[in-house]
Design a protein with these regions (language model features):
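Bacterial Sec-dependent N-terminal signal peptides
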Residues: 1-26
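Asp-box/BNR beta-propeller blade signature and adjacent active/binding-site loops
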Residues: 22-388
Length: 388
């Protein structure tokens, strides 16, 4: 049976390649932010979503250097499928404190764009937050836009319902959330997140702590939110996608020494989750990755997965495709062979694949790059970006 399925998958890819090899390539690339330019010294943590009107919203963190200190949440908009971009917009600047980890979701029923993010005191560092010796905890916040991302509400502290007070570290995404399209939980908004927890057998930052993932979800268009049960052990930054039958899959950065993505399933809209397993088809070097339900392509439901597809370092940004609800990943398209790290995927209004990721010539964090390609290009030979 597995052999038959594999043969069918190969035939489908061959057919797809034949269908598109003569098609004119509609490709463009934009550097949205670059290290050492503008108001900030560094830019990291990409997130991109498509509004109900088809506008692209690209978020990132503007920062001095590392993950602590004065970090602002930034945004650029595109109303022409990524060909041109607006000037930089500051969504949240809280003096010298840290405002980051963007994770937006678009409510397709109301048009409202919800944006989860996390905040902590700028002089607190991750180790202190995990060990609970920081001056203040790291907290989830939420804001929204009703005008296609042009303006945003004041961020609201969501600690009471979205965070367990026994947790140390906390982070939303980074990446995007989803709205469930099928089954009894249709319309539910789901945001992936992660945290650290007390674990006597753990060794996170040389302390008795572990990493866990979870989701936040809302059944009333974002008025109220709940948190799911945790997914653990060794689970950190994550993204969620929906399968054809409404099952949710969490695709997770793993600290379990497997060099592969951790996977967990939910049959109840994200409230509870299965024990983790590791998908050896999706190799990783303990780095964030992104997954997207692209919808139907050539009559088949297609999922995409994007990450640095290596077991060490952060290089070889690669997108893989699945036509069987993430059971198998039958194609790998190299986007950029050089240093590269965090990423986010989007389906553009014109049907192309949008990829927003960190990359550079010497280090992965030199540029924040947006690339848009026709989906058929995923099945052609060659590298999308030979150079930056």
């Amino acid at each position: 049976m597995k052999t038959t399925l594999s043969c069918l998958a190969i035939l489908f890819i061959a057919f797809t390649f034949q269908s598109f090899k003569g098609e004119k390539k509609d490709f463009h690339q934009s550097v949205l932010w670059q290290q050492g330019t503008g108001k900030y010294n560094n830019y990291r943590i990409p997130s991109i979503t498509v509004t109900q009107k088809g506008t692209l919203l690209a978020f990132c963190e503007g920062r001095e250097a590392g993950d602590a200190g004065d970090i602002d949440l930034l945004l650029k908009r595109s109303e022409d499928n990524g060909k041109t971009w607006s000037n930089e917009q500051i969504v949240w600047d809280d003096a010298q404190n840290t405002c980051g980890n963007p994770c937006p979701v678009v409510d397709e029923e109301t048009g409202r764009i919800w944006l989860f993010l996390t905040w902590n005191k700028g002089d607190d560092h991750e180790t202190e937050i995990i060990h609970k010796t920081s001056s203040f905890p790291r907290l989830p916040f939420l804001c929204y836009s009703d005008d296609d991302g042009k303006t945003w509400s004041e961020p609201v502290n969501m600690n009471e319902t979205c965070r367990d007070n026994s947790w140390g570290w906390y982070a939303t995404g980074p990446g995007i959330g989803i709205q469930i399209k099928n089954g009894p939980y249709k319309g539910r908004l789901v945001i992936p997140a992660n945290h650290s927890y007390d674990d006597p057998d753990g060794n996170v930052r040389k302390g008795p702590y572990g990493y866990g993932a979870h989701v936040l979800f809302s059944d009333d268009h974002g008025k109220t939110w709940q948190k799911s049960e945790p997914i653990k052990p060794g689970c950190n930054e994550s993204q969620v996608t929906e399968l054809s039958d409404g099952t949710l899959v969490m695709n997770i950065r793993s600290y379990n020494d497997k060099h592969a993505r951790a996977i967990s399933f939910s049959k109840d809209g994200g409230k509870t989750w299965s024990e983790i397993e590791h998908d050896v088809q999706l190799v990783e070097s303990v780095c964030q990755g992104s997954v997207l339900n692209f919808g139907t392509f050539n009559g088949k439901p297609m999922h995409l997965f994007l990450n640095p597809a290596v077991t060490v370092a952060r290089t070889h940004m690669t997108v893989k495709t699945s036509f069987d609800d993430c059971k198998s990943w039958t194609n790998a398209k190299l986007i950029y062979a050089g240093p590269s790290a965090y990423s986010c995927l989007a389906k553009l209004q014109d049907g192309r694949v949008g990829m927003f990721f960190e990359a550079g010539k010497k280090k992965p964090y030199e540029k924040m790059i947006f690339v848009a390609i026709e989906p058929g290009e995923l099945f052609t030979p060659g590298t999308v970006l030979e150079k930056l």
